[in-house]
Amino acid sequence: MSDKTPPPTVWPTLRANDARALIRFLVDVVGFEETAVYGETDVVHHAELSWPLGGGIMLGSVRDDAADGPTPAGQCSAYIVVDEPDALCARVRAGGANVVVDLHDTDYGSRDFAIRDPEGNRWYFGTYRGAPRAS
């Protein structure tokens, strides 16, 4: 049976001083899946990483020649839904991630934690899936 889930239509984007190292961190430590990486040597022109539960991010190397001007590294913040935050928190700690908000239960029923990646971006993980959509 084929998956009828529509592809994501909102993609958080970020820039990195060392995009290849950030990709390795997000894939090997956090659990993103590498979907596409385009570039030469140390420069990543475009990369897409998918999250196993849906959605994804796009990223690339910091570039001074961007049409809209340079975007500094470390300016992204994202919330990512996870089914097992305790297991993920243990995994990222073991992988050397900088946990900046310890695992905790929120007053709105989620179990959350947060890390800062090597580029300075903040990643929040938790069980809150958002408010239900109006029908």
How should each PLM-predicted stretch be described?
Residues 119:
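C-terminal catalytic core of tyrosine-transesterase DNA break-rejoin enzymes
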Residues 14-18:
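Short, surface-exposed ligand-recognition loops at beta-strand->loop->(often short) alpha-helix junctions
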Residues 1-13, 23-116, 126-135:
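Vicinal oxygen chelate
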